[in-house]
């Protein structure tokens, strides 16, 4: 990578996962925590296509290398965080990219997270068995 190459940053979060994404002009490689993307995502094609969806929407799959530092959560949560990070980096790349990404919903952070456990219950909503007598 040359010193004057343009680098675009984006941060994505999903559940407990956080992904810091760098877009660098290149051949379309995805590297997550120093490992190839398909290997890191356990060769699960739906997660791979989920993570690269913003690039496919804009037709830029083979124009940028994606370097990701992901932490927290599980593999699926990290894939969702990577998707949001890539979308935000693409908005930084060009403001014209914002509209198609917004229409597809790639710029919205998914607020769903694990609900906390309440005292008196076994799980977040599961109550102990009720006995009438």
From Swiss-Prot:
Matches recorded under HAMAP family: Ribosomal_uS9_B
Biased composition (Basic and acidic residues): 102-113
Name this polypeptide is given: Small ribosomal subunit protein uS9
Pfam families found in the cross-reference section: Ribosomal_S9
One Gene Ontology term, aspect cellular component: cytosolic small ribosomal subunit
Any GO BP: translation
UniProt biased composition (Basic residues): 114-133
Keyword list, A-Z: Ribonucleoprotein, Ribosomal protein
Originating organism: Gloeobacter violaceus (strain ATCC 29082 / PCC 7421)
PROSITE patterns: RIBOSOMAL_S9
Presence of the UniProt keyword DNA repair in the record: no
GO molecular function: RNA binding; structural constituent of ribosome
Family, similarity comment: Belongs to the universal ribosomal protein uS9 family.
Domain of life where this protein originates: Bacteria
Record region (Disordered): 102-133
């Amino acid at each position: 990578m040359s010193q004057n190459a343009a680098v675009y940053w984006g941060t994505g979060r999903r559940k407990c996962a956080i992904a810091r994404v760098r877009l660098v002009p290149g051949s379309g490689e995805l590297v997550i925590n120093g490992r190839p993307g398909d290997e890191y995502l356990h060769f699960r094609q739906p997660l791979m296509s989920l993570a690269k969806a913003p690039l496919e929407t804009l037709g830029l799959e083979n124009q940028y290398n994606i370097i990701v530092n992901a932490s927290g959560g599980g593999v699926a949560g990290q894939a969702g965080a990577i998707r949001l990070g890539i979308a935000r980096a693409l908005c930084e790349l060009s403001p014209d990219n914002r509209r198609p990404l917004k229409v597809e919903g790639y710029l919205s952070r998914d607020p769903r997270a694990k609900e906390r456990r309440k005292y008196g219950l076994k799980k977040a909503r599961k109550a102990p068995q009720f006995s009438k007598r």
